[in-house]
């Protein structure tokens, strides 16, 4: 058992023991209110009267998430370089440790937030922590948002950016022999689709993929979708709305580039080793774990972690930065990046 697995197991045991004690020895696994950390509960309570995304416009949804993320007090100092990818009008940002121009390992980061929201304003703190704690360069793709641009635009733009930086690795001093793809939520969806595309198109290969509470299937028929249909935070109706914004009305949502769980065995067998993280109180929990099982069963070295006491987007949300789940999972992610990108540490 690795060090992070030991720490996670210890946290898991302590948290369950605490909940059992509070509930007279009964573990109320189906009671979401009893299964979230106090910091998380405070955040959930603070937004309980806010309109859900499916009752506002995409622009309002973006403003609302930006407002939640407005506390930048935890943002760490980094250097950023904005790049326009060839003639594709795709914007990306290279993020490095402050003052460090060394040829560092690369994390190709694909952000989440429902394909509709998100960018450096929402993800800046999180990716900056990865940059500084793992000592890597992050390539952050500012892909076009839905519904202004529909599927597959976002995936195409991310792939174009990947190929561009691979072709210009020397110019930007990037170690493309040491590249990991990381994505959260819908970014996790696109990250694993990108990993499949690199094989199909013989593009640059990822050494590893880290998928954080990823969107894996549009079927929306798992037990966790039933248990957490109304949240907290992410609900079934919200996911339905996100898919509506992302795709055209007659789009088949079951194709692998939208629902990666449906990829062929061959496509999955060639995926890179994987760390997949899900959270306890999340409609996406079960599909993420089902994907981890499928990868593992098809021979892909896979680590799957379920983090207790928290909600979807917990790594992203600035109000949750001090929660035990966020701190521990950041440590897991950073340690895994270091293990993969540091010579003789694999």
Curated annotation (Swiss-Prot):
CC per GO annotation: virion component
Molecular-function GO terms, alphabetical: hydrolase activity
TM ranges: none
InterPro entries hit by this protein: AB_hydrolase_3, AB_hydrolase_fold, GDXG_lipolytic_enzyme
The EC number(s) this enzyme carries: 3.-.-.-
Xref: Pfam families: Abhydrolase_3
Family under the similarity heading: Belongs to the AB hydrolase 3 family.
The name this protein goes by in its record: Putative alpha/beta hydrolase R526
């Amino acid at each position: 058992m690795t060090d992070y697995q030991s720490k996670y197991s210890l946290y898991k045991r302590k948290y369950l023991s605490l909940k059992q004690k509070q509930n007279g020895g009964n573990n109320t696994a189906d009671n979401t209110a009893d299964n979230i950390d106090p910091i998380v509960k405070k955040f959930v309570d603070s937004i309980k009267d806010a309109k859900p995304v499916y009752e506002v416009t995409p622009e309002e949804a973006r403003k609302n998430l930006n407002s939640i993320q407005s506390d930048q007090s935890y943002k760490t100092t980094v250097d950023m370089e904005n790049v326009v990818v060839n003639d594709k009008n795709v914007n990306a940002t290279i993020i490095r440790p402050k003052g460090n121009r060394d040829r560092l390992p690369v994390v190709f980061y694909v952000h989440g937030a429902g394909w509709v929201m998100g960018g450096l304003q929402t993800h800046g703190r999180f990716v900056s922590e990865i940059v500084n704690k793992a000592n890597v360069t992050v390539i952050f793709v500012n892909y076009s948002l839905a519904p202004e641009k529909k599927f597959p635009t976002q995936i195409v733009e991310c792939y174009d950016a990947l190929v561009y930086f691979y072709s210009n690795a020397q110019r930007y001093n990037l170690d493309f022999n040491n590249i990991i793809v990381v994505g959260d939520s819908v970014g996790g969806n696109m990250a694993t689709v990108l990993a499949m595309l690199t094989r199909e198109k013989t593009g640059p290969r990822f050494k590893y993929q880290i998928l954080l509470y990823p969107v894996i299937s549009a079927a929306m028929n798992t037990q966790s979708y039933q248990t957490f249909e109304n949240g907290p935070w992410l609900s079934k109706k919200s996911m339905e709305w996100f898919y509506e914004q992302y795709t055209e009305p007659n789009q088949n949502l079951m194709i692998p580039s939208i629902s990666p769980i449906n990829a062929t065995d061959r496509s999955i067998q060639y995926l890179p080793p994987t760390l997949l993280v899900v959270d306890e109180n999340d409609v996406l929990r079960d599909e993420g774990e089902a994907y981890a099982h499928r990868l593992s069963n098809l021979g892909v070295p896979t680590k799957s972690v379920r983090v207790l006491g928290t909600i979807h987007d917990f790594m992203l949300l600035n109000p949750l930065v001090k929660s035990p789940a966020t701190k521990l999972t950041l440590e897991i992610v950073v340690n895994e990046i270091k293990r993969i990108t540091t010579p003789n540490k694999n």
